[in-house]
């Protein structure tokens, strides 16, 4: 069974709705960007999220800081 995880990442000015899905050992992320959905793919969920957040260059780190604690990988190595 596939489970889509919905997240709302917060920046100082606005928030971004994203979805994460694991498919065949890879992660797919979709972020609601101003020009439509932005997709990211990665071996790790963090990689997929960062790629999907590319339209928000300059505040990606700030948005990633708001990833809920249940996603421990977002804090690893930082």
Language-model features: where?
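Negatively charged, low-complexity tracts enriched in Asp/Glu with abundant Ser/Thr
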Residues: 1-13, 65-78
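Short arginine-rich
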Residues: 53-66
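A short, exposed loop/beta-hairpin motif centered on an aromatic-Gly-Thr core
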Residues: 32-51
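N-terminal segment of the canonical double-stranded RNA-binding domain
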Residues: 1-30, 36
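Intrinsically disordered, low-complexity regions of eukaryotic proteins
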Residues: 19, 34, 63, 71-72
């Amino acid at each position: 069974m596939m489970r889509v995880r919905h997240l709302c990442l917060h920046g100082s000015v606005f928030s971004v709705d994203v979805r994460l899905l694991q498919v065949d050992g890879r992660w797919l992320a979709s972020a609601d960007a101003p020009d439509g959905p932005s997709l990211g793919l990665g071996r790790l969920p963090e990689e997929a999220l960062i790629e999907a957040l590319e339209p928000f260059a300059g505040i990606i780190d700030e948005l990633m800081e708001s990833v809920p604690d249940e996603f421990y990988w977002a804090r690893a190595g930082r």
